[in-house]
Amino acid sequence: NDLNTEGVMGFDYRNDYPETSKERILSCEDLDQPNYEHNVRFWSDSNNQWNNILDNIESIRAIKATGGETLLTAGFIEFMDRAIERDVAKNITLEFHTNATKFNTANIKRLNQFGTLNFNLSIDSIYENYHYMRYPMVWSKLDASLRNMLNKVDKNRIHTFSFNPVVSALNAHYLIDLLDYQIGLVNEYQLNRGVFYVDLLWPERKYTNIKFLSTGIKKDLIKLYEQHIDIYRNIGVQLYTVIDFLKLHQDYTPTEQDRLDMLREITLFDKSRNQCYNDYLHPDIIEFLETPL
């Protein structure tokens, strides 16, 4: 069943009933099972189906939430507080997307009440390039928020620690630096399972899509990513999607109009934030933007 109320935040959850299944953690394998009850809901404080979720929270064994920023969304906070109030949070696997900047004391206290935590962290880049993409947030504050969570959340509760960047011309050269940073955290805090999963920009026609970069840049990126597929043993690295996409489009030669469209989109982006791409983007991207084809 689907419930859509302004698309504020979506919940994907599973119930366990004695007559249908044994308790088990949400997984891809579960989706193939005939007795698996799988539901998607959108939060609304006035929706009967949402209230039904809260009223029957004892039956929920796993929930996946996406946003908006979940840790600022009233529905997600309400769900966590209700589960804690009913003393059932310890039975729930909590999976959610977050930009990782809101790991404050109150939220960490909530997270420590849940049985299992799966973090899907929407972090698109690192250092100054991150600041460019996530203005006005700065990298030092993000790093402090992440470390605050990792220092205070019970490590036994953390099952998955996943970074989920979206690749574009803005950050393509910095994904490996971000991966190295995540590897450092996984090792430093002895986390159970790290995942680095890169998504493609959508829709594909967006002017900052990597398909519109020069053939030379695309080949360089393929080489960069392929060098890092198999060298990590303590983290799941998913770069094949990006590599395959680049290979599919590596022979596409961008037109002058493609270059101008990308430049225009980036400069409009800059004006809205009082920034300049020359200060943040990789030299190869800057050269591509400023060299007529």
Predicted regions, residues:
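Distinct, well-ordered alpha-helical segments
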Residues: 75-81, 104-111, 174-176
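Conserved acidic catalytic loop of the alpha/beta-hydrolase fold
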Residues: 49-56
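Eukaryotic beta-rich interaction modules
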Residues: 44-48, 80
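Short, acidic, metal-binding catalytic loop of nucleotide-sugar glycosyltransferases
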Residues: 82-88, 152
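Core AdoMet radical
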Residues: 1-45, 57-74, 86-105, 112-144, ...
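Conserved C-terminal portion of the radical SAM core fold
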Residues: 116-120, 140-290
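Amphipathic alpha-helical scaffolding segments
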Residues: 2, 78-82, 183
